[in-house]
């Protein structure tokens, strides 16, 4: 599955048994918009609400830390996703939050995941169908994944500060750094 799919591709695929569409919209805390209310008011037909703001490691002292493998598997199970599912993520956010969701899926080895090119804004601009309310979900059992090689924990990063064995790049903008 390509990492980026078009609105036309998604429109043609809607209704496929193995396709799960997730609204991954999230706004920064200083933004007054309510992503959950926006989803409830208008979303791609059949899309489920990911709630990316809570798709984090709830036990970590680090804000917005990547969810644990257990939390990842639990959330995917609640969303009715199986290892055979194809997942398309989209957002309607200035921070392009679908990209964070895509990263988390890929981090845990979920390969059949893509981002909708242009997000909900493009979908709406093309006059495509929208739905309101919550999409009913039949939960599934999602197996516990493992993290992909190449990821580092906070402890790994702190140890590297002394060892300087690896180059670390912080991609946040200056205001968040």
Regions found by a protein language model. Give the residues of each.
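Cytosolic catalytic domains that perform sulfur/thiol-centered chemistry
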Residues: 1-177
